[in-house]
């Protein structure tokens, strides 16, 4: 471990994914329906939910709600497969093809569709869990093991095997391009990302907290998380943060539960590290969490976990159909209009 201090002895327990030798990839697909009123999205969401039950469907799927820009909401499914071929078979199924890539959305539809599909080599992936819980992301179908590779700067990088042989820097260097407001409504767009994009899903689960701890988390810790996410979203060029969504998780029927996660993309792992190491907004999260621990005698039922991956351009497929201009990767990088026109319709888009 390149960054681990000598004689390192963590003060708290932590766990990390232990991928079986026969497993080479994780497919993580975020699939979103965007609208100012999700009542318009009911048909699409119903088709999506039904398709997840197919034999080739995901090993696990979460649902979440994101309050986005200009009053838009995103209803998002976060789906995991343990091999790319099964995912490809699922996409090819007629039940999925009914809605995949926004095929049923017309040029004036009140809804947009987007998908961000990542095919992640196992050596480009790492996880960390505060408890021995098998209900977080890939841990639904991958064992987790106790680890001492945490509680020091650089531990995230050390847990990712490929970091032993690569610095994982962006070919674009330190500076994220300035965002561009593109004409995106009524269009089917594909974004080409550069190599070594860093993806993080970092999550909080307060469902098992008692009333006092829950009140402390919501009143003290969560506001700093919201502030940090807002800063990242509004300062992309400074931080290298391409996209950061704070989402609240739901049941598959759409009921909000006591879980949230931030899903962020950075120009490189180094950009994520610099924000976590140095920026006041991240230090504030640590500070309020430590204050919560002190208030509750350093005993907590709050469950924390994250998944981090570094992605090559060929392993990211980014599609946006009839979405607002600040959705996902749209403000950055190379954008191509897919030459499969949207349906024609006399309906009027709700803006």
UniProtKB/Swiss-Prot annotation:
Key words of the record: Heme, Iron, Lyase, Metal-binding
Catalytic EC class: lyase
Cofactors required: heme b
Thermal behaviour (record text): Optimum temperature is 30 degrees Celsius.
Reactions catalysed according to its record: (Z)-phenylacetaldehyde oxime = phenylacetonitrile + H2O
InterPro entries: OXD (IPR025702)
Source taxon at top rank: Bacteria
pH dependence: Optimum pH is 7.0.
Pfam families reported in the protein's UniProt record: Dehydratase_hem (PF13816)
Any one GO molecular function term: phenylacetaldoxime dehydratase activity
Extent of the signal sequence: none
UniProt-listed Enzyme Commission number(s): 4.8.1.4
Family of this protein: Belongs to the heme-containing dehydratase family.
Protein purpose: Catalyzes the stoichiometric dehydration of Z-phenylacetaldoxime to phenylacetonitrile. Prefers the Z-form of phenylacetaldoxime over its E-isomer.
Subunit structure: Monomer.
Name listed for the protein in its UniProt record: Phenylacetaldoxime dehydratase
Organism from which the protein derives: Bacillus sp. (strain OxB-1)
Name of the coding gene: oxd
